[in-house]
Amino acid sequence: MKLGLFSDPHYSSAKLTCGVRYNSRSLDKIRRAYEFFKEQKCDLVICLGDLTDKEKTPERVRKNLDEIASVMRDSDIPTFCLIGNHDAFALGRDEFYSALSEFAPRDTEIDGKLLLFLDACYFNDGKPYQAGDNDWTDTFYPYAQHLSDALGAAQGDVYLFIHQNIDPAVDGDHRLCNADALFELINASGRVKAVFQGHFHAGRTSEYSGVRYITLPAMCQNDKAYYVFEI
């Protein structure tokens, strides 16, 4: 099975943010990514979050998402889009998935492989991120028991997809508040083959006890930040 992956386009009307993010260029990069995914005959495409970014109005954010959705739809490749902190801060979860309802991720089993999608756009107190929030360093996955149950019931290999970071090698600001507990749970399961992450724009790859942690470089900061993985 071939997966096409990309992360952190931060698509918006802004030409440059934070001195290094070329937000307005990302729509063209997404188009090129899907051309590549079609050439590679990918079975599924996954965006690992921060598809968009804040604008002056919610209407403009929705317009940006509509433009991206059109590219995804025209590709005819099944696509899942995880929500990232910038997506949640720009629109909120309900609005984001209202705009991208056909691309909302769902746990999926294909050819005996289980793909699990984790949403960590929550504060440490369990409250979900809302439009207008901005503390991206306070991030928490509140469904650890659900993950534990899913891993315990899995019969084959498991692949996890999440925007924020669990990998201990990534700096602390980008890691979940409960990353250590999730890391232990993943290692103890013996089922997880890889954890795919975004959020940390530099990207990195680590491996612990046979589990690969693959953090994709940000599309908004790189001309070719889209990848194919065979699982």
What residue ranges belong to the model's regions?
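Short, catalytically relevant binding-site loops at active-site mouths
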Residues: 122-124, 165-168, 202-203
